[in-house]
């Protein structure tokens, strides 16, 4: 059976590229369904940990769960990572710390603990490496992966493997990752940023134009605000 739809909660699979008629998984009732006509054909993915440094700190300090958290240096430093609560105030990576604190005075600032981040990165990339050796890490918290030819070895098409990997990481580490699946690295990178956090987005040949046309040129990897003008 062709797999065109997958439930991200229970791993139910179905053949309809539109997903279940009512939008709910027939096995568990979840609405977290990934469905696409090319779902079982695409094999290039981009994996990106969600607000990685800040998420590690929040996991280790549950009392900060709903607080704005910034990981970075002192007042003269810059923001390494801002959690999603802090981002709602306009705080972003590489922002000078004094500007970040002006935008979000109640933020909890935590100095980076790279020993801890490297350890978690190795756990995540190690789990990804169990699927295929064709991994290209871009940093501690993101990587490209090519799952071509792994369907029989890993018990399902790349989309199924990656959704199962997402669940594994969340269950084992308490951290979440977002994944973009596409025919090439360029589109996979863009896809991974479309549904964060804890997202899974598919950009195939059939929907690439419709999905990308409304987005600004700065959404393209490597295109900054200056060049985008």
Model-identified regions with their sequence ranges:
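Gly/Gly-Pro- and Ser/Thr-rich, intrinsically disordered tail segments characteristic of DNA damage-repair
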Residues: 1-229
């Amino acid at each position: 059976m062709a797999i065109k739809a997958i439930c991200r909660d229970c791993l139910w699979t179905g053949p309809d590229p539109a997903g279940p008629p009512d939008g709910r998984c027939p096995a568990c009732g979840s609405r977290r369904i990934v469905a696409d006509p090319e779902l079982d054909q695409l094999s290039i993915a981009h994996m990106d940990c969600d607000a990685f440094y800040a998420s590690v700190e929040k996991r280790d300090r549950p009392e900060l769960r709903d607080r704005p958290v910034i990981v970075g240096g002192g007042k003269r430093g810059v923001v390494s990572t801002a959690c999603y609560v802090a981002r709602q105030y306009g705080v972003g990576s590489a922002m000078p710390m004094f500007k970040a604190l002006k935008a979000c005075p109640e933020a909890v600032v935590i100095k980076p603990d790279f020993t801890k981040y490297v350890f978690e990165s190795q756990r995540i990339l190690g789990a990804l490496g169990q699927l295929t050796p064709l991994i290209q890490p871009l940093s501690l918290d993101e990587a490209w992966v090519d799952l071509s030819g792994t369907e029989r070895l890993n018990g399902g098409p790349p989309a199924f493997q990656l959704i199962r990997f997402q669940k594994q990481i969340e269950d084992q580490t308490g951290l979440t990752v977002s994944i973009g699946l596409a025919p090439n690295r360029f589109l996979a990178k863009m896809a991974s940023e479309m549904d964060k956090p804890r997202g899974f987005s598919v950009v195939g040949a059939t929907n690439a134009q419709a999905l990308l046309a409304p987005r600004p040129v700065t959404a393209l990897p490597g295109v900054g605000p200056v060049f985008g003008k």
